[in-house]
């Protein structure tokens, strides 16, 4: 899950004072001459920044902030949220949560052009905002023309709605199947993993074919990518055999597509046809090899956490999955297809999600809301928080309200829903309560679900405990594990 994903919504009109009124303070590696602020790391990856506080004067809804910049020798960040910074930081007045929206990253060399930060402030008026210009964890030189800095209201992206009246039909074996509960499997699952998850009560495992996750410009060697995929499919053969033995189903998850992501965090194949063609070909390969396994394959999970942050791209997150689904159906007419929504398959993206005009498709959502709670302390992101927190309105009913776009989508299209991921970091106060609230709602709605993740990274592993990543230790039984096992065994279902 990308913790900084921001969901776009409608905008309200407001204005902003002139750039000349902004008082910029210079930090590490920052200098100013006239209207030009320069950040120069002198070849080191220690970054640098300039900061300002601005008053948005009660702006709401969508905003667009712009500034002109020029870069030289800006290094490639090792995380998608590092690199060139044109970023806002403010506290959401409604929830109290901190927000860090930022512009798309640029690297290398580029001449003067406009950086654009587009985000949704929400319906509650926002006042003071911290603005950062700079470089984070990369080397290079960047110049900002602060006389060009501007903030304005912005009508945010509206994705086209298709197949508005379509009702999804399912074969009897899917339509009448009881609710399935399970977990994301480790990267290299063993028979012991499958057996243990089944003993806990798991009925479904999400098999992730993943590498170089969220790494920029990864998976560009197509021959090597296909060779890697073949190895993952060889392991899948074994996983399916173990799943049959222990009475489980497997969701086949292509976790990283060819081409990976660009430096703006958007999937490369949305604008690179060679990557898109290989993506579709990979699903054709999978369908040819595994068709006829409907008894054990829950579904083909087309694309993990699609991320499209521009409205106009040659191949949208939706069309990319449509092309893959159509290619699969020409080969395998029986296996269920699992489709994901934009913005990391988050619940708010279902406001504009459209169904495929295709039967036997299950729609997946990932639940990490509020992300400042679920991902606190992950890569230094977000301060400590607790669950529930009535002062912020964080409780079970808040989760219900955030899932409302998904429940509405399901009703509108008679669609089945699969929660492919949900979790809270091990050291979060009240994580067991958060998990139980989520599971209670998923069971109420009758949605299949997979906890993230079983016997994987220790931050999500329910057998680890500690107050930070450094102090986490495997202790076996934890309150989170008890909640998960109770949920897997349906003890909380009504």
Identify the residue ranges that each predicted region occupies:
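Acidic-and-aromatic substrate-binding clefts and catalytic sites of carbohydrate-active enzymes
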Residues: 108, 183-193, 212-215, 227-230, ...
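N-terminal carbohydrate-binding accessory modules
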Residues: 154-219, 223-226
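Bacterial N-terminal signal peptides
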Residues: 5-15
